[in-house]
Regions:
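Ubiquitin-like/PB1-type beta-grasp interaction modules and other compact soluble beta-rich domains
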Residues: 1-84
């Protein structure tokens, strides 16, 4: 499992959890797992076309996924994903 750090404004949708355990795979799969656990997050992270909203930035550790493989960046067991 990996974990996603939840930004403070979105914690009200995760029962005030600062971090949530998610399945590993790719970044997009991990974020989808998060929204399956907390469906109210979906509209805040994804647009009508089910693409991540343009203002959502995602990091694995300190690396911006846009500098890696984007949404298809592999997520390993124990990785920390941050949503900004």
């Amino acid at each position: 499992m990996a974990k996603i750090i939840i930004p403070t404004p979105l914690r009200k949708f995760t029962s005030n959890q600062a971090a949530v355990a998610v399945q590993s795979g790719t970044v997009i799969e991990s974020i989808r797992d998060l929204t399956l656990q907390f469906p109210d997050l979906d509209k805040h992270l994804f647009n009508e076309d089910q693409q991540l909203r343009g203002f959502v930035r995602v990091f694995i550790g300190e690396d911006d996924i846009e500098d890696l493989q984007g949404h298809d960046t592999p997520v390993q067991q124990g990785d920390t994903i941050s949503i900004i």
